[in-house]
Regions:
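Conserved, single-site charged/polar hotspot
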Residues: 1-152
């Protein structure tokens, strides 16, 4: 479905190179790996290996769309759940395989909230403040190299 919307950024591994071509129907995902992140830490390139082929998904928007199956529920920090029918809330996440005794049976996507992955994370700033860091320390963390001064 996403290939039809943006085929130049949904690529198939063929003879050692990625190219734009229709995606074959597959029944099993064998691996998911984030291979590139943007400056803010958002997933920017993702490789999905399946029983029928390997695919590279480029851009945080495409990644959020491809990984959102429309039925999986998102568990928020407060424990509440919400349905995400079309798009994951953010590309700021890690992926961890879920195992039974021996086999991978699924993947957990552990995210960093709603956002675009640039600037200051509200959750991050809040947690830093709860750990005792001051406003200047928090701002310097998120905006490295900036100088904080009084306006005159």
């Amino acid at each position: 479905k996403r290939y039809e919307a943006n085929g130049k950024l949904i690529l198939t591994l063929k003879d050692g190179d990625y190219c734009s071509q229709d995606i074959k129907t597959f029944s099993k995902v064998t691996d998911i790996t984030i291979i590139k992140r943007g400056p803010g830490g958002v997933a920017d390139e993702l490789v999905i290996a399946t029983d029928k082929g390997t695919y590279k998904i480029i851009s945080e928007y495409n990644i959020r769309a491809v990984l959102c199956d429309g039925v999986t529920r998102v568990v928020r920090q407060d424990g509440s759940e919400v349905s995400m029918p079309n798009l994951l809330p953010s590309a700021f996440f890690v992926i961890e395989p879920s195992h039974d005794k021996k086999n991978v049976v699924g993947y957990n996507i552990i995210g960093g909230g709603f956002g675009h992955g640039v600037g200051m994370s509200q959750n991050g700033a809040k947690n830093m403040a709860l750990q005792g860091l001051g406003a200047e320390q928090i701002l310097n963390f998120f905006y490295e190299g900036c100088e904080i001064c009084s306006e005159q």
